[in-house]
């Protein structure tokens, strides 16, 4: 299975194929419905999540690794166990300082990821 179906109750990570989101970043769309979406992003050290904004509210959980995040005008280093809130429309991005995984929850779902 490459990507799960909308409203799929059970999604097993091992069954999902990742796709290259950018250099050094592999994205896996996990469970989702119209109202929200869970996405795993695997970052290599030095990979960049370019500054961007979108009309979705986003919560990021740092599952592993270390990242320097920019949200609006603030820049902070976060590591495993930390979480971040990015309101819709705010500019944000990151640089991976130590190889790691970010888990993002978006509301509503990101149709552009399907």
Q: What are these language model-derived features?
A:
Residues 48-49, 68, 84, 88-93:
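Histidine-centered metal-chelating micro-motifs
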Residues 56-67:
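Glycine- and acidic-residue-biased ligand/ion/polar-headgroup-sensing regions
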């Amino acid at each position: 299975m490459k990507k799960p179906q909308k409203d799929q109750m059970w999604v097993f990570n091992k069954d999902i194929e990742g796709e290259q989101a950018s250099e050094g970043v592999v994205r896996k769309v996990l469970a989702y419905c119209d109202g929200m979406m869970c996405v795993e992003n695997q970052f290599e050290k030095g990979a960049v999540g370019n500054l961007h904004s979108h009309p979705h509210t986003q919560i990021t959980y740092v599952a592993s690794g270390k990242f320097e995040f920019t949200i609006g005008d603030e820049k902070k280093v976060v590591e495993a166990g930390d979480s971040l809130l990015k309101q819709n429309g705010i500019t944000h991005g990151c640089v991976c300082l130590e190889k790691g995984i970010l888990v993002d929850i978006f509301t509503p779902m990101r149709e552009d990821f399907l």
